[in-house]
Amino acid sequence: GIEIINEPNTTTSWPMMNVTERYKAVDPELAEGTGPIAFDWLKDFYVTAYHRLRDADKGALPTDKAVVFHDGFDIEQWKDFMRGSDGRLAPEFENVVLDTHQYLMTAEMMGCPQTVEGYDDFVRNTYAPMIAEMSEYFPVIVGEWCLFNSVGCGVDTHGGQSVLNGEEGAQAETLTAEQKRSLYQGVAESQLAAWSKGSGFYYWNYKLLTDTVNTPGWIGWDAWDLGRCIAQDWFPSRSSPSLVTATCRAVTMGPRGAHTMD
């Protein structure tokens, strides 16, 4: 299949991410007037894109290939999208998948306490029911997720900001190896259980190029690297074998780490 556009920055995510401060413009004059995407516009864009992709006169994408659309960081905006008069998916839309990207750093921006207990509670009581509910409207994939969080970094990352954003990372580890293992195994278990309520999930990323051990300010960022997470035993062996197997299969399945979707 094909995803129409990745991570459109909408009226929900723009203020939450504080985009113009997080990502400073190289050319401020050229960037002047930049702003978020409205959901009404985005929905029209997706419908137009869908019909063009399925257009038989233009080498149509066959219906056995999914058309994927990203939620714009607001998954509940899509309950009435592509619906017919009966409230079901309109017959003109076939094999459509909703992509949502869910991170603990985003949970922190939404007020999740930066504690092991806080992460577990947020994932189980916010993310899990959210995925389950939206799966009644579309097949849902969690197209990006990882174990990264501020506790593992030893500092508040203010929503996943790094030295590249001007944030100063911890200069020394604040957790022992065993404490890190316990932290990450816990958030892995709760997230894997939550994502299993959807139709698939993809770890971001398989491999980082940054040397997080020998480069100052990057403590905790190795949690983005699936290979390092597996090597350091950060996935719980006590989880459902199918969930662990699905995640570990990513080593041979591709760069994001795919949980297969029927």
Enumerate the predicted regions with their spans.
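Active-site region of glycoside hydrolase catalytic domains
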Residues: 1-153, 193-203, 212
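Fungal extracellular Ser/Thr-rich, low-complexity intrinsically disordered regions
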Residues: 232, 236-262
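Substrate-binding cleft of secreted/luminal carbohydrate-active enzymes
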Residues: 102, 125-129, 133-242
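Feature targets compositionally biased, intrinsically disordered low-complexity regions
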Residues: 34, 58, 219, 253-256
